[in-house]
Amino acid sequence: MASLFTPFSKDISSRKNISSPTDSFGTNLSLKRNFDFGNERPEINSLICLAEPIMDITSEIDIQMIQEYNLKWGDTILVNETGDDKIMKIYDDLEKMPTVEYVPGGSAENTLRVLGWCLNMEPYERNRFKVSMIGSIGDDVYKDKIIKALGDLGVNPIFEILEGDKTTRCGVGIYKKDKLFATQLRASKRLSEKFIDEHLDEIISYKSLFIEGYMVSNKFNICKKLCEYFVKDNKLIIYRFQLLLLLNFTTKK
C-alpha cells in the first residue's frame, strides 16, 4: 500500500525537472509533515477508528425487484428512519433471498476490511497490528451479526449499544455488475460523548486515530476532543472524506 508521501517515481533523477510546490517563503511543501517526529520514525502498531457502524444486507436480485421499487441501477437512497416508506419492504425481501450476506458496510468498515487483508490479520487473535472501531449500534437482531463480522476480520468493536434503538443498515441489491443501495441511518448517528469519556483512556492508548468523514459533520465535538488528545501526544490522525461537501464543512469548522 502506497504511503501518502511516496513520490510518483522512486527514481529521483527522473523528477529533477519537476518543480515542487512552495509556500510564500519558498519552503518546499512536499517536504513538510503534519507531525514533528525528529529523526526517529514512530512505530505505529495500533489504530482506532471512529465511525458509524453499518450492517450491509447484500444479495443478488432480479430485474423485477428493481421495477417493483421504481429504482435505478447505481441509486443510493436514504430510507426514512420511522419506516413509513414503501421502500422499507426491500430489507425483508433481501433477507429472504438465498444469496443474502451480512457484511460490515460503510466507508470506514470497508477501509478496515482492506486494512485487515493487507496486514493478514487473523480473526480473534492478538495480531501484531491492533485495530479497533468505536461507534454506536442498536440492541436488535443486527447487533451480534455486526460484532461477529468485525471480529472475523480481526477488528475489535468498542460499541455503545443503545437500548430501544436499531442498528443502521444498508440494503445492497446486486444484478450482474450493477448495484443499488438503500441506507437507513439509525443508531450509528447517536454515539454519545458520555460513552467516549468512559472509554477515553483506552482510546488515547492507540498510536493512530482514523476518523470517518461523516463523524466530522455529525459528531464534531467528539472528533475535536479526540483530535486534541492525539495532537497533544504527537500521534497520527487520518481522515477519510467521502464527499466534497464534507470536506467543505470540515474546512469551515
Regions from the language model: what does each represent?
Residues 71-92, 144:
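Acidic-glycine-rich active-site phosphate/pyrophosphate-binding loop
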Residues 102-132:
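Active-site alpha-helical elements of protease catalytic centers
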Residues 2-76, 100-103, 125-130, 136-138, ...:
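Ribokinase/PfkB-type carbohydrate-kinase core domain
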Residues 60, 65, 83, 114-117:
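N-terminal low-complexity, intrinsically disordered patches enriched in charged
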Residues 86-99, 154:
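Glycine/charged-rich beta-loop-alpha catalytic/anionic-binding loops adjacent to active sites
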